[in-house]
A protein has these predicted regions:
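C-terminal nucleotide
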Residues: 1-136, 151-191
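Short beta-strand->loop micro-motif that forms the acidic, two-metal-ion catalytic signature
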Residues: 145-151
């Protein structure tokens, strides 16, 4: 509430397609990459890259150690996503909403290009939200269907959601469902 924002959540009504093994395959690829890199998990790799004198060079060297392009893409997504989350927390805490939005956008773009877990409904919803005033928008969850979230000014969720619904109708997609989420104090017990 401090920044006068709301989080628009849009369920694209695109069914999750996690039962065909694609999500598990990505996870297995990342686990295999961690073994090749000699680490317990890719968070260890991300931490090392973040602490390097030249993180870009450290990322390049990490990716160069991997045997194929698909694995490189998956690892690039995971490692850069870990850093994006850290950067988002810093940007949001400091009130830099524009930077926080750019990080949302970069996250979705990486999920689409490197992790390859988006579907047309997710990409259209994100694109429409971005073009209609969202600071940033991204898919959420495991992908292959499901929902997006968009960071918008308070009072704009309904307008942005309607633009998404209009575009979904044009594209022949199922009508999406949307809700606005607001920051609030945590629950507590009154004495």
């Amino acid at each position: 509430d401090k920044y006068n924002l709301e989080l628009l959540v849009v369920d694209t009504q695109a069914p999750h397609q996690l039962n065909d093994g694609q999500y598990a395959q990505r996870r297995a690829t990342c686990e295999q990459a961690a073994k090749i890199l000699g680490v317990a998990n890719l968070r260890v790799t991300a931490d090392g890259i973040a602490k390097a004198d030249d993180p870009f060079q450290a990322l390049k060297e990490t990716l160069d150690a991997l045997p194929d392009e698909t694995m490189k893409k998956r690892v690039r997504h995971v490692v850069t996503e870990i850093e994006r989350v850290r950067s988002f927390v810093r940007a949001f805490a400091s009130g830099d909403i524009e930077a926080a939005g750019r990080l949302f956008n970069a996250s979705h773009d990486s999920l689409a290009a490197d992790y390859e877990v988006t579907v047309p409904e997710l990409d259209v919803a994100v694109d429409v939200a971005r073009k209609n005033g969202a600071y940033g928008a991204r898919m959420t969850g495991g992908g292959f269907g499901g929902s997006i979230i968009a960071l918008v000014d308070k009072g704009r969720s309904q307008e942005v959601a309607q633009k998404i619904a209009d575009e979904f109708e044009k594209q022949g997609f199922h009508a999406p469902r949307a809700l606005a989420a607001y920051a609030a104090k945590s629950a507590s017990r009154e004495a």
